[in-house]
Amino acid sequence: MKKTPIIFALLLFVFCFSAIATSYAAENRPRFFHEGDGRLKLASEKNNYTFDGAYRLGDGYDETALKAIHRVFDAPFDPAFPKVSLRLIAFLDFLEDRLHPGARLTITSGYRSPEYNTRVRARGGLAAKASLHQYGMAADFVMDGVASAKVWHFVQALDFGGAGYYHGRTVHVDVGPARSWDEKTSGVSTGISDDNKLIGMITDFDVYRPGDTVTMRFIRMTAFPIGVAPVFFLEGRNTDRHAGKALLFEPVFAVPIEGRCPLFDNIDQMAMIRWQLPARLPPGRYAVRARFCGEIMEKMPPEVATPTFEVARP
């Protein structure tokens, strides 16, 4: 798989993202199941950058604010290919609003490139091979006025996201699958994620409308190349008559694909996968399922599905 990006596709993503974000924010409709009031106070312990203000405004997500937040996370900023997940930003906001409104979060570890994550592991650091820091979906932090143990227990009770606590001053929080661990149960050095055993897929938001563009990405990969069947499935997750019905579709990938089993070589190639929801899609709960193809490793699942998302009424 060549690394040449589809520039037009990325420009189209920026346009669609801006239009959708503006439409929802103007009507004050939530985009995530766990989000706060749209304001955060952040500081980086690593590079001393700070952010204090609103990142979600009446006319959408503020690009200047998101750029500043990326700096705090030590992540490069590209509006066409954001490195820090909006879902993570919204979840940190959610935690701050409920545990200590207005508190500052000091980020001790934010975004990590795959190369940097590998270096951390090589020098014996507690970095998972499939770390969600590589996807901008995780943060280690300290919340002013709140014990990290309290944050850990609070996230555990939500049954959403990951929470790790090593009985020190910081806590790890991510927006991956619901799970929790400490220094005795982290499994970092056990090979738990080898051979793509934990591979998954997510959507960019939790709430959409018919006709919106859904942007998907695969996460927690540990071995490449990976073959992905170019036909995905939209499946109902309701209890009504739409439950279980699948709609086949071909999404647009971030890189050119060829054949019935295109191969992908890195994390970035398996991000920015887009598809426009049908304009007449009935409101309800859905998930997208994708199948792998070619040589599938023994521990790797043959297919994965996104967490359930909601399609609201127009």
Task: Show which residues each predicted segment covers.
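Bacterial N-terminal signal peptides
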Residues: 9-18
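Catalytic cores and adjacent binding grooves of peptidoglycan-active enzymes
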Residues: 24, 38, 43, 126-138, ...
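Charged, often glycine-rich, active-site loop that binds/positions anionic groups
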Residues: 115-131
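Active-site acidic/histidine clusters and adjacent loop/turn architecture
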Residues: 46-108
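Short, hydrophobic beta-strand segments
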Residues: 262-282
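Acidic helix-start/capping segments at beta-turn-to-alpha-helix junctions
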Residues: 104-118
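Short beta-strand elements
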Residues: 295-314
